[in-house]
């Protein structure tokens, strides 16, 4: 269930709220990636409650003030029961506040949109029973950020410069505290020499602190010939720092084949240099698994998207390939993505607002994996949908989707099983 609404208190003051309630009851393997050991079926119950409140002040006579404050809370409880296994449950709660102001001003050599603000949130995790894979602890995260997006007055050029300061602190009763902080600048530029062509480039830095699970988990990872491979805590994990560079181009053509059609194409290349990259190592000799830092890692890849819209059909096509390598040893890290092509076609059925859809996801075999890890075969997964958007009631929408229609058994490039055949119902009404 999802609901949201807003109210205009005055012309300058607005407020709103949203609520999302989710419940799921299922019977599933304790760990779907295991084929040995205690991996019987578990009764699993999941309940998630998300709530958000926001207030916005935007006076029409002052282009420098457009401030929005948001309070949010997310609470997730997962309880699992199984035969011959102690019940386990865990609760994850995230609460935070975000304040941002956007200012519009004209300062040579163009128009500026300034965005600046702050965010604070706390994540808390509490396990019970045998849920040692999810350690007790909390994380406090504080951010300050600033960005200036400038549109040149006399040239078709957009320039973005900004910076973000992040401060991270985690606590676990057994391991104590971990603190980290980082200033992450970024810059981007886009040029549109014609109405149909756009070229862009960017460079940005970021940091990622280790999660509680990466530092503290100590449960069974998997079984091999009846013997367990355990997670080993690593309290010496360092935060990950990286620099990403991206370059690409896009085109947009209107009236290509018919009067009302549009073709959009966009493609880009990205490369990331990471320091203290957080990866996972599986030691089969000692039967243990743990997270560790790769001193220097290289991640790179390609993204391409195409979108064709017309009165007769809509077609979206996307392609991605991502590689990851230890820059020192030249070994694959196995956290990339093999050649993956996604095709999404929607065709109107009649003139009453009904559309039929077909989505195909095609993935090549994953061969650039860690040394000793198995290669994953390629796969093709097809999904079908039927949606209804009545012309007379534009605020209503309903759809039914059959995901993985042929119940294909496959794993993605990281070895995670894909969901089986699933039927989803969706409806939306706005007033």
Predicted feature locations:
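Transmembrane beta-strands of outer-membrane beta-barrel pores
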Residues: 21-25, 73-77, 120-126, 163-169, ...
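Signature of Gram-negative outer-membrane beta-barrel scaffolds
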Residues: 111-204, 209-211, 220-224, 318
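Surface-exposed extracellular loop regions of Gram-negative outer-membrane beta-barrel proteins
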Residues: 32, 167-169, 177, 191, ...
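Flexible loop and strand-edge segments within Gram-negative outer membrane beta-barrel domains
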Residues: 12-64, 72-94, 130-132
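Short loop/turn motifs that connect adjacent beta-strands in outer-membrane beta-barrel proteins
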Residues: 11-12, 58-66, 104-113, 151-157, ...
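Membrane-embedded beta-barrel scaffold of Gram-negative outer-membrane proteins
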Residues: 66-80, 200, 236-300, 309-313, ...
């Amino acid at each position: 269930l999802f609901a949201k609404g807003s109210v205009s208190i005055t012309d300058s003051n607005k407020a709103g709220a949203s609520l999302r309630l989710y419940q799921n009851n299922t019977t599933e393997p304790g760990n779907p990636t295991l084929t040995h050991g205690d991996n019987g079926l578990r009764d699993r119950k999941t309940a998630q409650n998300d709530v958000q409140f926001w207030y916005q002040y935007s006076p029409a006579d002052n282009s420098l003030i457009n401030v929005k404050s948001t309070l949010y809370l997310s609470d997730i409880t997962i309880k699992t029961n199984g035969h011959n296994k102690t019940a386990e449950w865990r609760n994850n709660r995230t609460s935070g506040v975000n304040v941002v102001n956007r200012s519009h001003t004209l300062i040579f050599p163009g128009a500026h949109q300034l965005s600046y603000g702050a965010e604070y949130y706390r994540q808390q995790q509490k396990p019970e029973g045998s849920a040692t894979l999810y350690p007790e602890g909390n994380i406090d995260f504080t951010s300050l950020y600033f960005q200036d997006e400038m549109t040149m007055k006399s040239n078709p050029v957009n320039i973005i410069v900004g910076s973000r300061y992040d401060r991270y602190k985690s606590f676990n009763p057994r391991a104590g505290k971990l603190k980290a902080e980082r200033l992450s600048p970024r810059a981007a530029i886009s040029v549109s020499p014609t109405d149909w062509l756009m070229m862009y480039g960017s460079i940005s830095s970021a940091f990622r602190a280790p999660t509680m699970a990466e530092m503290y988990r100590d449960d069974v990872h998997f079984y091999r010939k009846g013997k367990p491979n355990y997670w080993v805590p690593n309290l010496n994990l360092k935060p990950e720092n990286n620099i990403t560079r991206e370059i690409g181009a896009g085109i947009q053509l209107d009236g290509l084949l018919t009067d009302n059609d549009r073709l959009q194409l966009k493609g880009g290349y990205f490369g990331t240099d990471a320091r203290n990259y957080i990866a996972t190592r599986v030691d089969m000799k000692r039967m243990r698994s743990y997270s560790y830092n790769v001193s220097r890692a290289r991640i790179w890849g390609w993204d391409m998207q195409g979108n064709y819209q017309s009165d007769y059909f809509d077609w979206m096509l996307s392609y991605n390939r991502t590689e990851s390598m230890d820059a020192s040893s030249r070994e694959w890290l196995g956290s990339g993505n093999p050649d993956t092509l996604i095709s999404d076609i929607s065709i109107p059925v009649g003139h009453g607002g009904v559309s039929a859809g077909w989505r195909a996801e095609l993935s090549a075999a994953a061969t650039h994996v860690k040394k000793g890890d198995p290669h994953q075969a390629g796969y093709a997964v097809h999904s079908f949908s039927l949606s209804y958007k009545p012309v007379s009631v534009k605020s209503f929408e309903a759809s039914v989707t059959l995901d993985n229609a042929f119940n294909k058994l496959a794993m993605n490039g990281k070895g995670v099983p894909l969901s089986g055949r699933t039927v989803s119902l969706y409806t939306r009404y706005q007033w």
